[in-house]
Amino acid sequence: MPVLRSIRARLSAEQPLAGVRIGACLHVTAETANLVLALRAGGAEVHLCAANPYVTQHDVAEALGEHVHVGDYRDGLAAVAAAEPDLVLDDGAELIAALHGSGLRGATEETRSGLVHLRTLDVQCPVLAVNEAASERGINDRFGTGQSALDGIVGATHMLLAGQTVVVLGYGWSGLGVALRARGAGASVIVCEVDPIRALEARMEGFEVLPSLEAAARGDVFITVTGSRDVLRAEHFTRMKDGAVLANAGHFDVEISLADLRALAGDRHAQALPLVEQYEVEDGRRLNLLARGQVVNLAAAQGHPAAVMDVSFALQALSAVHLASADALAPGVQAVPASIDDEVARLKLVSLGVEIDVETPGQQAYRGRWSPA
């Protein structure tokens, strides 16, 4: 993770987080460990709990040592909250929701679903929307989720995607990435959306766009990428083909209604493969649920490649420094400063050995004429 490594070296030299206590609710993986070590190098005391205990890498948690809580999800949140952090780095917004009114100096949120939730609250501290940074959306969501979700599905099932009909529910940046990668693997892709702008974009990209109930009868593989709940439910399950595969690449295990699936199957379910539960509905059709409905790229694969998380966690680290050092920021969800976004992108380009052009003074002056004051 060369970008985060360069940031860690700078933080170690400058100590901008000295005396700052950080609470983090993130997936406990080797990549996250590099973020924690960078923050510690900058002087911070970091308390970490697992955003999803099912995907925790316990050897990583052990290696990180003190202030790491990887048991029950709620117990972990409570332990980090009890540390009374100054800053919070969150994946899902539950830690922010619990602490934003208790004197937090600031927070960051990694997920779209978390930001949707926070925008319904009267948040009492500044929250930097890391998920909406340009470098995050372009790299993490589009390329990271696009690749790792399919890694999880293929790894769990050993299926050939070519020739399959893949239904992608949700066409944000992550859904776009999943749809593009599935098409690249030879699948026919149907997109289902509730947002007319995104649905139009999907159609103009060449994907078939259908209501989810129509798509339910045609799909071989269903991938939810919405950040919402009950996206696939009983009315969809009753229309699906025998052998349909159900995977969640969104957030938490609520996008596929497990209650509806279990109600339809009763006791007719079995472990077909280590990460595949097969549910047989009354007419004999078998529906295959991957990784208990958990996030498939983490629960059935290794998550995003380190090269992707390098960008995400570089944004997190520099955002934490910004929150710790900036003068009083207004409360509420707000953009990551463009200067941080640009710096991370430039560092990533350097790590790839890529050089780009620089505007001439004349070009800068010309563009400046049209820039808002």
Predicted regions and their residues:
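A short helix->loop->beta-strand "cap" motif at the edges of active sites that frequently abuts
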Residues: 43-45, 103-104, 123-125, 186-187, ...
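Glycine-rich phosphate/diphosphate-binding loop of Rossmann-like nucleotide-binding domains
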Residues: 29-44, 147-219, 224-226
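Rossmann-fold NAD(P) dinucleotide-binding segment
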Residues: 6-9, 13-16, 93-98, 217-218, ...
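Glycine/serine-rich phosphate-binding loop and adjoining beta1-alpha1 elements at the start
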Residues: 1-17, 48-56, 61-164
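Adenosine-phosphate binding glycine-rich loop
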Residues: 1-5, 18-21, 29, 126-163, ...
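Short, well-ordered coil/turn residues at beta-beta hairpins
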Residues: 25, 91, 223-226, 248-249
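ADP-ribose/adenylate-binding Rossmann-like module
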Residues: 50, 88-90, 101-113, 237-280, ...
